[in-house]
Amino acid sequence: MQEWQALIARTHAAGLKVMMDFVPNHVAREYQSIAKPTGISDLGEKDDVSKHFSVQNNFYYCWGQPLNLENIAKHSSYIEQPAKATGNDCFHATPQKSDWYETIKLNYGIDYCDAGGRSEHFSPMPRTWMMMLDILLFWASKGIDAFRCDMAEMVPAAFWQYAMSEVKRLFPHVSFIGEVYNPSLYRLYIRSGFDYLYDKIGMYDCLRRVVRGECDATAITQVWQATDDIHTHMLYFLENHDEQRIAS
């Protein structure tokens, strides 16, 4: 931690800011903390694995079913009982190769498999909300300037509104950048408190088509106009770790 804080200090001394990647939707399937503070529980450590869904559980469980990886690796020796839902919302015990089978979905109080589908259970507050807020506050206290929030749209906006307001109350300088790919959700997540959102589906995809000669540059104007009311919250980019180099 001393090395980390020294890095932050050097970065700030150079006139730069430090942004940390925050992945709130999922964890690795073999996740476990290796340096957790005294008195802090791992995600899932106190779960009642006999329940598919509970607001007090951090994960979703396929009760009574072991994880079956036959579609991914024919002779896998990996054992998980009961199976946990994957990060891309696969709620059965036999994920496909196209699923995020190496990840586990975090439970923010939405029951995806009830009779009505996606019912919200936000009161009492889900345990995951409190644990993830603690993580944000911990790193904000170390001098982080911003969080880049991975797959933010897969986490309910209600959580973001709660968590970001709490972080900004104590650390008003901290900014939040959300990875939201669905343009119909842009305004919801901005209202929830995000300072900036990726404009991947809009501006990035448009610029890519222009560079490839698939459309005229006038298309850029149309993209701008589609988000004119929220353009100050849109983060435009040419490259990131998920996309090809723009020159290629």
Spans of features found by a protein language model:
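Short, solvent-exposed polar/charged micro-motifs at secondary-structure junctions
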Residues: 16, 186-189, 245-248
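Substrate-binding/active-site clefts of carbohydrate-active enzymes
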Residues: 1-4, 8-138, 169
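Active-site clefts of carbohydrate-active enzymes
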Residues: 102, 108, 228-248
